[in-house]
């Protein structure tokens, strides 16, 4: 069984963290329906052992960071807050690239201000190339150099990447030390298998998003059947599979519900047998 912790930057974090995206309003735009509930979810997450929170100032925009500050400031020493830059929101709630030096610098300062911090623990460069929905090839040298300069200025402790290809990871590692990569990955969507193993070899965290994303009905049925046999939810099984997939995988499931938060956190105690793992591994081939 893999360890329940992994080093992210210079801190050891619990591998089951929390993603704050769903704390904003519908479509990750505007304020939440109930700010008090959002604050309660964050405080309960820490009470359940979460010490790794994933956020961004373009969630809302500004909303999730402001709620995190209201709920948790002053922050405990063992809490790692990871944020992202490289995108912005249009007035119509669209997601737009924000890769110019001025936009990247503004994003870092917006995150600092709204989180109430003098330095950011980890900043992921969110890459939006091609259609912006999945990784696409293209140089990220210019953008990463801007982020590395802000690291040298003391505004950012550690640098990560999001929505990137293996070629971009290699390019980035020539410019700065990379502590994490955040891409889409789950039982059904396993394009990053080789990347995960390579990053694990080098002690770099891999943070998958959309743990139930991109499933066909057949794949969902298989997962549901496995979950039912274990007395668990499909999400719990999907999260448990990820935890057992590789020791460098850190999870950031998001929710705006305390009940769902508790369900997600219970996945840490769910051990999947070799037989169950084999069945789940077959999902990506269906």
Swiss-Prot record:
InterPro entries: Aldo-Keto_reductase, NADP_OxRdtase_dom, NADP_OxRdtase_dom_sf
EC number: 1.1.1.65
Keyword terms: NAD, NADP, Oxidoreductase
Reactions that this protein is recorded to catalyse: pyridoxine + NADP(+) = pyridoxal + NADPH + H(+); pyridoxine + NAD(+) = pyridoxal + NADH + H(+)
Active site: 59
One term of GO molecular function: pyridoxine:NADP 4-dehydrogenase activity
Taxonomy, superkingdom: Bacteria
GO CC terms of this entry: cytoplasm; cytosol
Name of one Pfam family that matches: Aldo_ket_red
GO BP term (any one): pyridoxal 5'-phosphate salvage
Binding site for NADP(+): 210-218
Matches recorded under NCBIfam families: PRK10376.1 (NF007695)
Family note: Belongs to the aldo/keto reductase family. Aldo/keto reductase 2 subfamily.
Protein's job: Catalyzes the NAD(P)H-dependent reduction of pyridoxal to pyridoxine in vitro. Is not able to reduce 4-pyridoxate, and to oxidize pyridoxine or pyridoxamine. Has Kemp eliminase activity towards the non-physiological substrate 5-nitrobenzisoxazole, producing 4-nitro-2-cyanophenol; this activity is not considered to be physiologically relevant.
PANTHER family: AFLATOXIN B1 ALDEHYDE REDUCTASE, ALDO-KETO REDUCTASE YAKC [NADP(+)]
Protein name in UniProt: Pyridoxine 4-dehydrogenase
Gene coding for it: pdxI
């Amino acid at each position: 069984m893999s360890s329940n912790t992994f080093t992210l930057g210079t801190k050891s974090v619990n591998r089951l963290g929390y993603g704050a995206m769903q704390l904003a309003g519908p479509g990750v735009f505007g304020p939440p329906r109930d700010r008090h509930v959002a604050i309660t979810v964050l405080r309960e997450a820490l009470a359940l052992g979460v010490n790794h929170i994933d956020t961004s100032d373009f969630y809302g925009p500004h909303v999730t960071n402001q709620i995190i500050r209201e709920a948790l400031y002053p922050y405990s020493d063992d809490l790692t807050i990871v944020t992202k830059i490289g995108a912005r929101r249009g007035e119509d709630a669209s997601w737009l690239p924000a890769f110019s030096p001025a936009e990247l610098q503004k994003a870092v300062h917006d995150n600092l201000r709204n989180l109430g911090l003098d330095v950011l623990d980890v900043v992921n460069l969110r890459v939006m190339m091609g259609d912006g929905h999945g990784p696409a090839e293209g140089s990220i040298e210019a953008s990463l150099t801007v982020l590395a300069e802000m690291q040298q200025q003391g505004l950012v402790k550690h640098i990560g990447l999001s929505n990137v290809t293996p070629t971009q990871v290699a390019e980035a590692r020539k410019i700065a030390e990379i502590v994490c990569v955040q891409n889409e990955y789950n039982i059904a969507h396993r394009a990053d298998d080789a990347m995960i193993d390579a990053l694990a070899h080098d002690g770099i965290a891999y943070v998958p998003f959309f743990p139930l994303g991109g499933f066909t009905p057949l794949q969902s049925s298989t997962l549901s059947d496995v979950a039912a046999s274990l007395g668990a939810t499909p999400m719990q099984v999907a999260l448990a599979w990820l935890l057992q997939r590789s020791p460098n995988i850190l999870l950031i499931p998001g929710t705006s519900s305390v009940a769902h938060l508790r369900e997600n956190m219970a996945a840490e105690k769910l051990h999947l047998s070799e037989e169950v793992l084999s069945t789940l591994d077959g999902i990506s081939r269906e």
